[in-house]
Regions:
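Carbohydrate-binding surfaces in secreted/extracellular proteins
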Residues: 73, 165-200
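Short carbohydrate-recognition loop motifs
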Residues: 40-57
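Boundary at the C-terminal end of the N-terminal hydrophobic targeting segment
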Residues: 22-24
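Secretory/extracellular carbohydrate-interaction modules
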Residues: 56-150
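Flexible glycan-contacting loops in extracellular carbohydrate-active proteins
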Residues: 197-223
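Beta-strand-rich interaction surfaces with strong enrichment in secreted/lumenal proteins
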Residues: 57-64, 162-167, 208-209
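Bacterial N-terminal signal peptides that target proteins for export
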Residues: 1-11
Length: 223
């Protein structure tokens, strides 16, 4: 067996053993980067992405997710005295669509470019974990309005927490699960304390009129 074929075999074995979402982390071509600073650094180590972002960054998983699905990942907010270390905004978008380009979420990718206000132009669901300098955790729905639309109209808060139990702890691994079930409910929780960290339960009838169920779903990790 040649060295080249061994590497190909090894890679294939690793990818088969890893969960679907972890496979995507290994292959950067499955991610679309919207980086306001132009200086983001992403290091790949085994099944982990280490991200250093000087300014606004949106990292989209660019494969389509449809039907019922669960998004799961582990994440840590590193606080080690680095220049860009900041304990705030462990955020996630999902169920995202652009009504201006319903068949291509990334048509305005260069325009959005990690600038947070511009994501108001999308329809999606959002969790801002430890937002506002780690003082709030909020679950919102976005309604695809103009970027300068007030938050109350463009992205109203569905549920908010301000207690310490729902805020970020530095250098802690979080097991995040987001489950979407069209026929039953939508939940957002941390795996280790699901009952405490659930943000919202919504029956299908509450959101069936939105573009969420009618078009393609995407996963986004925002930091």
């Amino acid at each position: 067996m040649t060295k080249s074929s061994f590497h190909k075999l090894l890679l294939g074995s690793v990818l088969m053993l890893l969960p679907f979402t972890v496979q995507a982390q290994v292959v950067l071509k499955n991610w679309t980067i919207e980086d306001h600073s132009g200086k983001v650094k992403i290091l790949v180590s085994s099944d982990t992405l280490e991200i250093t972002a000087p300014d606004g960054l949106t990292l989209w998983y660019n494969q389509r997710l449809t039907g019922d699905y669960e998004i799961g990942y582990r994440v840590k907010m590193l606080m080690q005295g680095g220049k860009y270390d900041r304990l705030s905004d462990l955020n996630c978008f999902w169920g995202a669509n652009d009504p201006e380009y319903p068949d291509n979420l990334f048509a305005r990718s260069e325009w959005r470019n990690g600038i947070f206000q511009r994501y108001k132009t999308l329809s999606l669901f959002y969790v801002g974990y430890g937002g506002n300098h780690n003082s709030t955790t909020r679950f919102r729905q976005y309604f695809a309005k103009a970027a300068d639309t007030s938050d109350a109209i463009a992205r109203p808060v569905i549920k908010e927490y301000t207690d310490k139990a729902h805020l970020l702890i530095p250098n802690k691994w979080y097991d995040i699960k987001i489950r979407v079930e069209k026929e039953s409910q939508l939940t957002v929780s941390t795996a280790k304390s699901c009952s405490d960290c659930r943000l919202k339960r919504m029956r299908e009838t509450d959101i069936s009129d939105s573009a969420y169920w009618k078009t393609t779903h995407y996963l986004q990790a925002f930091r």
